[in-house]
Amino acid sequence: KIKSVHKVVEKKPDVIRSPYRDKNYIIYIICVFLYAFTFFQLFTTQPVYFKRELNLAETSIGILMALNGLVITAFEMVIVHSIDGKRNTLQLISLGSVLLGLSYLIFNLFPGGFILALISTLICVVGEIFSLPFMNSHAMSRTNAHNRGQYAGLFTMAWAVAQVLGPAAGSQIAYNFGFATMWWIMGGTFLIAAIGFSYL
């Protein structure tokens, strides 16, 4: 009898790569931090700006903030599903960052009250839809089963630190130098993040 010999091929384990040695991921995390740093102005300094500088009533401010959530709820999944896998995620994140930057800079470019705030909010919503859903998925696309926790931890840390520093920095800039300066800085920071995302 001829015995067949089956050679057992062992699957090689995934290479365990540290996120701290992943140069492109570090650049990505820096861009995510810049994005989040400016993004949190939406919930802190922007409502104050609406009330003090645009003289909006609290009811109007509440309507604008609710509109943001309603539009995202209604359209985000449809839009994301239609473009997911068909476009480079980094380019989409970059586009979203540009739109968010414009939603801030518009305050320094045009006079206005509620209409200006409404236009800014709608631009902001589109920017969020094109960027936020893809950020975490892009980060996780660089991982394997062995280092996913490390990559996720660094990503979460970027958002957590930005949530602490962003609102504090924004309010201090607005208090000491005025809202116009604050919008130039925050809008410009969004554009810097957009350039970083597109570079990757």
What does each of the following model-derived ranges do?
Residues 2-31:
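Juxtamembrane intracellular "pre-TM" segments in multi-pass secondary transporters
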Residues 21-42, 122:
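Pair of pore-lining "gating" transmembrane helices in MFS-fold secondary transporters
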Residues 91-106:
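Structural signature of the two symmetry-related core transmembrane helices
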Residues 108-120:
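Helix-loop junctions at membrane interfaces in 12-TM secondary transporters
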